[in-house]
Amino acid sequence: MQREEGFNTKMADGPDEYETETGCVPLLHPEEIKPQSHYNHGYGEPLGRKTHIDDYSTWDIVKATQYGIYERCRELVEAGYDVRQPDKENVTLLHWAAINNRIDLVKYYISKGAIVDQLGGDLNSTPLHWATRQGHLSMVVQLMKYGADPSLIDGEGCSCIHLAAQFGHTSIVAYLIAKGQDVDMMDQNGMTPLMWAAYRTHSVDPTRLLLTFNVSVNLGDKYHKNTALHWAVLAGNTTVISLLLEAGGNVDAQNVKGESALDLAKQRKNVWMINHLQEARQAKGYDNPSFLRKLKADKEFRQKVMLGTPFLVIWLVGFIADLDIDSWLIKGLMYGGVWATVQFLSKSFFDHSMHSALPLGIYLATKFWMYVTWFFWFWNDLNFLFIHLPFLANSVALFYNFGKSWKSDPGIIKATEEQKKKTIVELAETGSLDLSIFCSTCLIRKPVRSKHCGVCNRCIAKFDHHCPWVGNCVGAGNHRYFMGYLFFLLFMICWMIYGCVSYWGLHCETTYTKDGFWTYITQIATCSPWMFWMFLNSVFHFLWVAVLLMCQLYQITCLGITTNERMNARRYKHFKVTTTSIESPFNHGCVRNIIDFFEFRCCGLFRPVIVDWTRQYTIEYDQISGSGYQLV
């Protein structure tokens, strides 16, 4: 096992033993630091208690503490051993108990007078430092209950939060912040926890967690003025670079040598980092002319461009095709101009962080031109009572359900800053601060069936999926409206297809029965290119809407699961998954599933089970027995 300046883990025959570790050392020459693909902590998991029969009577108290032999330790202490006495390596019993996570011995030694913040070892560290380096959250909690001070620094100038950040112990970072540690605290080397995480931990956490606590992203260290983005580039930490840029990391921030993060990336000839940082500059308009820079800096304007572009493109495609021009060369040049315009808008104004803006714009534009076509092309040709009136009624229902799907709260799990910290402390002190049930971005305990949406960056109760066509997540708060949206949208598209076919029958000369299908397609496309273009759009949307509606109905009715649960069932312990089926604890039969989902009451005939999924943390909730409905 490699040695580092302070700690070592002797794993062949025993538990952790203290030597040296390079954890937190002054980094005075960053140009000498080579990118790392990972960081070896120099630790293994400590061995558990010995389970085989052994003669502990000859063991000294240090070895007995390392292995957690409580009776032997108590025997020696009762015989007069001073629990404050350090061994030949200047390490106390409390240090050994802390690094090996012997909570019962920590309680015992403190009850016998052990000093909770006693310094020891080559690094002059406290037991809390040792427990933090090893990632023993339960030990950190226990020591702090006895008054251990996490703000004390060790011989290398690091407090506990810096150690937890650089070793990737996200739960400990969260607990320390919740207990009052400053998220921007600098160690004696001028490094913040975010800088250490960016340099040492090649995963999304704890960087993501620190960013959620509103850490100062663009703060520079004391000696080199390197920001966290500089340190991430020095380490080749591509995962963290993306997170820092999304959080507003300044690509042009310079250190004492006048170097930006992009300059460091170029020095290391890392193509991915260079491209990513250059894209970030372009997204902020730094490399654009001044008149474009102001527009590009306006996020609301960029969103309007993304929403408005599909309106223009859909119209131009149909308009150019419908022009009375025989030369396809001219039309081809016009289409080339449309393509060039879209490329310019995309490169100059599209914001790829607005994932839903473009699909939402495509949906709104398609429906807008379909309604224009309906009222200006079909209105005089179709029967009002049997066609137009049902179409208008369907449209009202469609607009209502779309609006609710788009703008309703899908089930965002909310908490105040104090509630978040209280949750972290409660989970940590009950041994439940596990990232499988705790969201390191939203800083909340995740209810059952919830999931963090990577697009919206929020935890959603009873999460189904993120739908780009409505620009929102689909969850407990709007899933029923989303089903209504799909249902009425499908009928609207069917009416549109009917209108197109009726128009061709009335206004176009066709010879389908004589010349066949392909000749018919040519005739209707030539007769009215705009109508044919609307027909193609209708068919495209019909296909995905029909498939999605059927899948949703099947999952809701027959399986009792969400799309997320169906795709990730193996990740959840409460699902029984075989090669052919998924058994859901939320499936209560087709009838009951429908009644509960749509909350059917039928004038009191049915009594659906209403569950607040934003606060439901177990699979057990008050259910109505029987077939899923109850006569009242």
UniProtKB/Swiss-Prot annotation:
Expressed in liver, testis, kidney, heart, pancreas and brain. Highest expression was seen in the brain. Localized predominantly in the perinuclear regions of neurons from the cortex, striatum and hippocampus. Colocalized with HTT in the medium spiny neurons of the striatum and the spiny neurons that project into the globus pallidus. Pfam families: Ank_2 (PF12796), DHHC (PF01529). The keyword Chloroplast does not apply. Palmitoyltransferase that catalyzes the addition of palmitate onto various protein substrates and is involved in a variety of cellular processes. Has no stringent fatty acid selectivity and in addition to palmitate can also transfer onto target proteins myristate from tetradecanoyl-CoA and stearate from octadecanoyl-CoA. Palmitoyltransferase specific for a subset of neuronal proteins, including SNAP25, DLG4/PSD95, GAD2, SYT1 and HTT. Also palmitoylates neuronal protein GPM6A as well as SPRED1 and SPRED3. Autopalmitoylated. Autopalmitoylation has a regulatory role in ZDHHC17-mediated Mg(2+) transport. GO terms for cellular component: cell projection; glutamatergic synapse; Golgi apparatus; Golgi membrane; Golgi-associated vesicle membrane; perforant pathway to dendrate granule cell synapse; postsynaptic Golgi apparatus; presynaptic membrane. One of its GO terms (molecular function) is protein-cysteine S-myristoyltransferase activity. Its main location: Golgi. The keyword Repeat applies. Residues 437-487 form the DHHC domain. The DHHC domain is required for palmitoyltransferase activity. ANK repeats lie at residues 51-86, 89-118, 123-152, 156-185, 189-219, 224-253, 257-286. GO terms for biological process: axonogenesis; lipoprotein transport; peptidyl-L-cysteine S-palmitoylation; protein palmitoylation; regulation of ERK1 and ERK2 cascade; regulation of modification of synapse structure, modulating synaptic transmission; regulation of neurotrophin TRK receptor signaling pathway; regulation of programmed cell death. This is Palmitoyltransferase ZDHHC17. Its EC number is 2.3.1.225, 2.3.1.-. The chain crosses the membrane at residues 305-325, 326-346, 358-378, 382-402, 481-501, 530-550. It is found in: Golgi apparatus membrane; Cytoplasmic vesicle membrane; Presynaptic cell membrane. It comes from Mus musculus (Mouse). Keywords: Acyltransferase, ANK repeat, Cell membrane, Cell projection, Cytoplasmic vesicle, Golgi apparatus, Lipoprotein, Membrane, Palmitate, Repeat, Synapse, Transferase, Transmembrane, Transmembrane helix, Tumor suppressor. The active site is at C467.
